[in-house]
């Protein structure tokens, strides 16, 4: 494990977390019909989603090292908060109880109740294989993989409105792409024309 401190990347990770938290707090605060509030929410959501991509990109740069104990600890934490949030919603906020809602809360990863945690858990499970894959590809093959992935899952839906995966960018496809880009940057650095 690399013991070198990367204070710039650590700071960027903190900024990405702040953007994500701001999106969730402010995005749920301004819900009037005012067009200015709608534009503000759109702006905050854009920043927050950028924060998600940055967070995964940095995770890719450092690489996820699978650890069974940490994996199960993460699952327990997600499950705990899922159950607690369900109880708060049904008991204190008087949200009607549904069997679907209960099942979703009992199986938050499989039901994709929290899209990011579902994606992160899947990425965490596949990380040993992704890490091995990228270290066995030549730089040229790695670039081709990223370009193909980017074309079909970023460029085509954004510019051509041709969406293969209907997840509006909030799914395992884009999370994996950001992770792979982070791994590429760690291995090969920035391309010369971007320095």
Label each PLM-derived region with a short phrase:
Residues 1-153, 193-194:
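Membrane-cytosol interface segments of multi-pass membrane proteins
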Residues 55, 171, 176:
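Short, well-structured alpha-helical interface segments that form or flank functional binding sites
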Residues 71, 142, 165-173:
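Short, aromatic-rich membrane-interface segments at the entry and exit
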Residues 106-111, 158-169:
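Membrane-interface helix caps and helix-loop-helix hairpins in membrane proteins
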Residues 161, 172-173, 192-195:
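Alpha-helical transmembrane segments and terminal signal-anchor/GPI-anchor hydrophobic tails
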Residues 175-184:
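Alpha-helical transmembrane segments and their membrane-interface exit regions
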């Amino acid at each position: 494990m690399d013991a070198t401190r990367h204070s710039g990347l650590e700071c960027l990770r903190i900024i990405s977390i702040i953007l994500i938290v701001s999106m969730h707090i402010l995005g749920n605060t301004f819900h009037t019909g005012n067009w200015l509030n709608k534009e503000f929410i759109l702006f905050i959501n854009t920043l927050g989603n950028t924060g998600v991509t940055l967070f995964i990109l940095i995770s890719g740069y450092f690489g996820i090292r699978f650890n069974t104990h940490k994996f199960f600890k993460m699952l327990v934490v997600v499950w705990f908060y899922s159950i607690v949030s369900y109880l708060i919603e049904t008991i204190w906020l008087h949200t009607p109880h549904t069997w679907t809602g209960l099942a979703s809360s009992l199986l938050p990863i499989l039901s994709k109740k929290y899209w990011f945690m579902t994606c992160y858990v899947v990425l965490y499970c596949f990380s040993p294989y992704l890490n091995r894959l990228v270290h066995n590809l030549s730089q040229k093959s790695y670039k081709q993989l990223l370009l193909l992935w980017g074309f079909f899952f970023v460029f085509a839906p954004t510019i051509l409105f041709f969406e293969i995966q209907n997840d509006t960018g909030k799914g395992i496809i884009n999370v994996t792409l950001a992770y792979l880009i982070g791994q590429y940057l760690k291995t090969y650095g920035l391309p010369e024309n971007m320095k």
